[in-house]
Amino acid sequence: MSASTKRKRDQAEESVPAENPASTDVEKAIKPAQKQEEETSFVDLGLDPRLLQAIAQQKFAKPTLVQRKAIPLALNGQDVLAKADCGSGKTAAYVLPLLSSILKRKATDSTAFTTALILVPTRELADQVSKAIEQFASFCAKDISTAKLTDKVSSKVQRALLSNSPDIVISTPSTAWQNVNSSALSIDKLTHLILDEADLVLSYGYSEDLENLSRSVPKGVQVMMMSATLSDEVDTLKGIFRRDPTLLDLKEKEAEGEGITQFVAKCGEDEKFLLAYVIFKLKLIKGKCIIFVSDIDRCYRLKLFFEQFGIRSCILNSELPLNSRVHVVEEFNRHVYDIIIAADEKNEMLGDDEEPAETAEAQDDAKKSNEGDDAETEAKRPKKKAKKSKGGDKEYGVSRGVDFKKVSAVINFDLPTTASAYTHRIGRTARAGQTGMALSFVVPKDLYRKHMPTSTPACENDEKIMARIIRQQAKRDKEVKPYNFNMKQVDPFRYRMNDALRAVTKVAIREARTRELRQELLKSEKLKRYFEENPTELSHLRHDGELRTARQQAHLKHIPEYLMPKDGKQALTEDVGFVAMRKDKKGKGKKGRGFKVGSRKRDPLKTFKARRKTK
């Protein structure tokens, strides 16, 4: 090495700035702490050993972020308000510390009284919470008693359920207050009050019931509120219960490539059905899928439309009995059904939780546009409260809280009316660190009302709503990508779509609703009585049968080869299954009707000699 080269190297080394020892020490201290927190196990959280056994039985590897943060606070008796993503484990975050505290108390005091009241907005969520408690308490079932008040039973039955003072009561606010007011439920010694999906509890019109309950609960009760969004409703709840809880605004770190991939497709109202037909008939989406529509009629229109093409699906809406709804979700989670068509009738109750600055920006844009008055009215419109539906279960809810497992895709056949409802809909997929896809159909303003048989008022403001959704997702560093179908390949299927839509008339939809409701009521009674004694028979009860109220055309169930796109052929014919034309001809004729040996030798068409008659 030359002297000049060595001199340059020495100068370069001297010019490198020295590390700040203080900053280095801080970084070294922070990184191990973060790593240690991420490696925290359920054992480190200080839970009861029996709960740890149940956790191990369910094969939970380690606690999620919301569980790591909320459980220690809850065990210390602090009030908690936790905001975490859908599918992040919020239920376990309050159930585990609750069970642990009950077991700790019962070790020294065996007095029976209601310790905890869990308030939920919907019957479906109540059933899910009840099952979660049952699973986590599997090794201490004798020490934990639970009562679920959301089943449709008489007040006498509810009073009987509460007569033994169960440790935990799960209910909607209205039912809870009715029982407290009638003295069937005593909450004088209540120690825990939990609100799951806290923002939705208020949006469903339970404000008066919550006010009454807040005046009845003891002063020292511990309050826990869980939600996937932080909106004004949550602030209202804090005021109702006069609490200042520890706020946990949490977001799990996503691994690279994980999460939800969001797409939007602009199309006409009739083209929604065309694209849905192509997607499911050509199997462009693999795995289980939830399709959200705006009302019950749309549920049956889409189901009857799918029936024309032999596409099996089942329905979820507020008209169906609770037992049937719960069973549909359970069977869907067990991979019995692949497609659920869900009526999200209450998504309009949630006001948009966008920031005031964004609302002002929307108002400014609205003033500049030709539609200034309408858009400004939309921006200033107050949040809607629960609307009383003419029929159906007012405590029904499918887009919030319900734990659909391993859902590959969510399709917003009808776009929700708020960006908040959109967030919760797409939260049904990509749960617990999995991946998923969300596809939304948007009807442009110039295509609205162009096809009256399939038109619905819910599509009137699709473009405005999607603009808000895109802004909200951008704040979360999420992108809603355009999904452009190759309409040249899709158009050949249009005439088949038109044939199927013509068959799905209003009369057919009305008859389908009546028939489905009658069938599900019968199934619900069976689920309630017979299947309690014969649980193994439950798997034979299906909910995806054909309604057959629309005129069906057999040829629509099969796709002619000339209609198939070139790229779609291979994907469609991979799993063809048994085809008679390809059967091996060896051994043909060995089964079935027999024939006499030698008959071929006496073929009259070849020999012109008829066979002699035998006497």
Curated annotation (Swiss-Prot):
One of its GO terms (cellular component) is nucleolus. The keyword Disulfide bond does not apply. A motif (Q motif) lies at residues 40-68. A motif (DEAD box) lies at residues 196-199. Its main location: nucleus. Residues 71-248 form the Helicase ATP-binding domain. Residues 583-594 have a biased composition (Basic residues). GO terms for biological process: rRNA processing. GO terms for molecular function: ATP binding; ATP hydrolysis activity; RNA binding; RNA helicase activity. InterPro entries: DEAD/DEAH_box_helicase_dom, DEAD_box_RNA_helicase, Helicase_ATP-bd, Helicase_C-like, P-loop_NTPase, RNA_helicase_DEAD_Q_motif. Keywords: ATP-binding, Helicase, Hydrolase, Nucleotide-binding, Nucleus, Ribosome biogenesis, RNA-binding, rRNA processing. Residues 351-363 have a biased composition (Acidic residues). Residues 25-37 have a biased composition (Basic and acidic residues). It comes from the Eukaryota. Residues 259-491 form the Helicase C-terminal domain. Its EC number is 3.6.4.13. ATP binds at residues 84-91. It is found in: Nucleus, Nucleolus. ATP-binding RNA helicase involved in the biogenesis of 60S ribosomal subunits and is required for the normal formation of 25S and 5.8S rRNAs. Belongs to the DEAD box helicase family. DDX56/DBP9 subfamily. The Q motif is unique to and characteristic of the DEAD box family of RNA helicases and controls ATP binding and hydrolysis. PANTHER family: ATP-DEPENDENT RNA HELICASE RHLE-RELATED, DEAD-BOX HELICASE 56. This is ATP-dependent RNA helicase DBP9. The gene is DBP9.
